[in-house]
Regions:
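Mature catalytic core of soluble alpha/beta enzymes
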Residues: 1-171
Length: 171
């Protein structure tokens, strides 16, 4: 997956630097997923890179018969779980950091749990959130939407809920 992405970026470097939705010229499955997720969330395709790569890795595991597996790519998680699991959230300096976990029931298929932060990690952030976590069966979509919400989040702003209508994302 990473080699596919790197080869595409070598041919189309703008794909890697735009903060806006972008339609690639060609590219494979990972590139297509990133671009589609970015269009849905209104962000550039690289906002979905960690989720898309984790998803590709989990697909390989599931394709080999894994019924339980987790890939955590810097807070962007792809998982398949035949048992209940708990997923904690590290939110940097927030007083809520490492103090709670999401409890996920056993489930069929691959699921995405992606967290984006303005205070943890090297990503460019246009917002103020310590952690925004988004769940979706489309791992790239969860990653892109977590980034989009983090970028827009301002103290006291409650407009974001309207953006999720009809997207397949739960936040």
């Amino acid at each position: 997956a990473r080699q596919e992405l790197e080869a595409y970026i070598a041919r189309d470097p703008f794909f890697a630097i735009t903060y806006d939705p972008y339609t690639p010229r060609g590219g494979g499955k990972v590139v297509g997923r990133m671009a589609a997720a970015g269009r849905s969330a209104g962000v550039g395709p690289m906002a979905a890179v960690a989720g898309a790569i984790a998803w590709a890795g989990l697909e390989a595991m599931a394709g080999a018969g894994a019924r339980f597996g987790i890939i955590d790519n810097g807070g962007d998680i792809a998982l398949v779980a035949d048992r209940e699991i708990r997923v904690g959230v590290h939110a940097g300096p927030s007083p809520l950091s490492d103090r709670f976990a999401f409890i996920l029931p056993p489930g069929e298929g691959i699921r995405g749990i992606c967290t984006s932060s303005a205070t943890v990690g090297p990503s460019v952030s246009l917002g103020v959130a310590d952690a925004v976590t988004v769940f979706s069966p489309d791992v790239a979509l969860a990653d892109a939407w977590a980034t989009a919400v983090r970028n827009e989040l301002r103290p006291g702003d409650h407009r974001l809920r309207r953006r999720f209508a009809g997207t397949g994302v739960t936040c």
